[in-house]
Swiss-Prot record:
Record InterPro entries: Orbi_NS1
Family named by the database record: Belongs to the orbivirus non-structural protein NS1 family.
Pfam family, one: Orbi_NS1
Gene source species: Bluetongue virus 20 (isolate Australia)
Annotated protein name in UniProt: Non-structural protein NS1
Top-level taxonomic group: Viruses
């Protein structure tokens, strides 16, 4: 391959096309109808490597350039390319897959340094808790910011606690007759008094040890208190509470409209759209008057998801009034996965997803209708059937497929997914790492990308493998801010032509090996052994990374 490319000075997109076609040629099915595939009496598409060797040995540049044009022409049909790649790569050959992945990992580690990603990782603040809670906007704790009142007064508390700067005010929801905006003048004084009293009585956060002031209050059902003593439950619920406060603090600002559209899919006219959506009277089949009352009067269980507001079902109710019953049933029965509920309980195969940020970045519609796939853990992501322009996404712990009509759309959608769900802290990390490489491979092979987009894709590959690897001082970079993460990925330096060609070869080889690896345990051929991870090589990569950190 390399001899052929260098002999005839093939570079750039033509070299990338040649590499790709060489890998899938053995499984290529050709009809020979156009007859342009024939070279020296054989089909060059099905025998691409033999044809390349023959053209190189015979020093026939005309035939060589015909082969390159064949490869480039085949790349125009990206769906066929993906299907052929998947067919070819999922059939293991007798080769050293493990060694090849390690070599790709070493090259990506070098690219991590040269691409500017390592420099950006140094600038990030230290992640306090490396076991980061994965948040998405399919669930929300916003109902708990609203003040429960009875006869114009805030309902008496039964217990108080705190999480960092947030006071937790526990009360009996049945004692309240309404819920109102905490900024209303009539309760503002009482609201501030609660903050002062919680700060006086509980000086230190019981979850984090934080000793600062109290600035916000969340009003929680008393039934929640015992579950907050469970570490995993508290870790997740507290983070969603913090996110709800951040969204509430945008009320009255320009960002409020973005948040409301992201959460609800529509923005009502007038002031304070968030409060309108939460407190507006709804035609529920029960006595509940609004979304806040419907949520806080229904208890959950030991699963933290059962206490949050399921936003996918809220959007279903906003679109079709009769579906409010689904929302109430979901909360009454304490379900924890909205897509499982839609797919299995309601026999619904699609749902709506909103992505305002992707819309702003690339100009696509923020609204998507997606196909509900399998729950995480039921089937590996590699088994998800992808056709035409589909790409994989995820809501909570459930996969879906969505259509991406351009390479830019696929790149941004995948970058957002990876930022939220993939934690790359070293080669051979976990199944999530393999999932990330698989998704990036889908973007690389299925869509025609520009050099700038491939440069961004390389940075994503580096992030998937090493983004959360410990730095020289042992701290982990904090990539929590999606906006700055996308700026680093999408606005980084563009690769030169030589760098682009080498990066494509590395990414392509990594994807090929990962797909082969994932099917190795399912398909057993004589003489083929499923690769296993050798920890020594991982340590060597980690040592090499540590050495790189010391250079900065």
């Amino acid at each position: 391959m390399e001899r052929f490319l260098r002999k005839y000075n093939i570079s750039g997109d033509y070299a990338n096309a040649t590499r790709t076609f060489l890998a899938i040629s053995p499984q290529w099915t050709c009809s020979h109808l156009k007859r342009n595939c024939l070279s020296n009496g054989m089909c060059a598409k099905q025998n691409f490597e033999r044809a390349m060797i023959a053209a190189t040995d015979a020093e026939e540049p005309i035939k060589a350039f015909r082969l390159i044009e064949l490869a480039k022409e085949a790349m125009y049909d990206r769906e066929t390319v993906w299907l052929q790649c998947f067919k070819s790569f999922s059939q293991p050959y007798e080769e050293d897959i493990e060694g090849k992945i390690k070599r790709c990992g070493a090259q990506l580690l070098e690219d991590y340094r040269k691409s500017g990603m390592m420099e950006e990782a140094i600038k990030q603040s230290a992640l306090i808790n490396s076991e980061r809670v994965r948040l998405d906007d399919s669930l929300s704790a916003i109902p708990y910011i609203y003040v429960p009142i009875k006869e114009g007064q805030i309902v008496n508390p039964t217990f108080i606690s705190r999480y960092r700067q947030i006071a937790y005010y526990f009360y009996n929801p049945d004692a309240a007759d309404d819920w109102i905006d905490p900024n209303l003048f009539g309760v503002r004084g009482q609201h501030h008094q609660i903050k002062r009293e919680v700060e006086r009585q509980i000086n230190t956060c019981p979850y984090t040890g934080y000793k600062g002031g109290i600035f916000q209050v969340m009003y929680l059902p008393i039934q929640l208190i015992n579950f907050l003593r469970m570490d995993d439950f508290a870790k997740h619920f507290n983070r969603y509470a913090s996110m709800a406060i951040q969204q509430y603090l945008r009320v009255g600002y320009l960002e409020e409209i973005r948040y409301v559209q992201q959460l609800f899919g529509k923005v009502p006219s007038g002031e304070f759209p968030l409060h309108q959506m939460m407190l507006m009277r709804r035609d529920f089949p029960t006595r509940d008057r609004n979304i806040v009352e419907a949520r806080v009067k229904r208890s959950g269980d030991e699963n933290w998801q059962s206490w949050l507001l399921p936003m996918v079902l809220v959007r279903e109710g906003l679109d079709q009034q009769e579906k409010w019953e689904w929302l109430l049933e979901y909360m009454d029965r304490k379900h924890i996965c909205q897509l499982c509920y839609l797919k299995h309980s309601k026999q619904i195969q699609t749902c709506s997803v909103i992505d305002v940020r992707a819309s702003e970045l690339i100009g696509c519609s923020p609204f998507r209708t997606v196909k509900i796939e399998e729950h995480v853990g039921n089937e590996p992501v590699f088994k998800t059937k992808l056709i035409r322009d589909q790409q994989i996404g995820r809501i909570g712990d459930h996969y879906y497929t969505t259509s991406c009509y351009t390479g830019a759309e696929a790149l941004v959608t995948t970058a957002i997914h990876i930022h939220r769900w993939i934690r790359g802290c070293g080669i051979w990390n976990d199944e999530g790492w393999q999932e990330g490489v698989f998704m990036l491979g889908r973007v690389l092979l299925r869509w025609e990308l520009t050099k700038a987009q491939r440069s961004a894709l390389l940075r994503l590959f580096c992030f998937v493998c090493y983004g959360y690897a410990p730095r020289a001082d042992g701290t982990v970079p904090d990539w929590n801010n999606l906006g700055s993460f996308l700026d680093i990925i999408l606005k980084g330096p563009e690769l030169s032509e030589d760098e682009d060609e080498r990066a494509y070869a590395t990414m392509f080889e990594m994807v090929r090996c990962i797909i082969t690896l994932c099917y190795a345990e399912k398909v057993h051929f004589a003489g083929f052994t499923a690769p296993a991870c050798e920890s020594g090589e991982v340590i060597n990569l980690a040592a090499r990374m540590s050495q790189m950190w010391m250079e900065y």
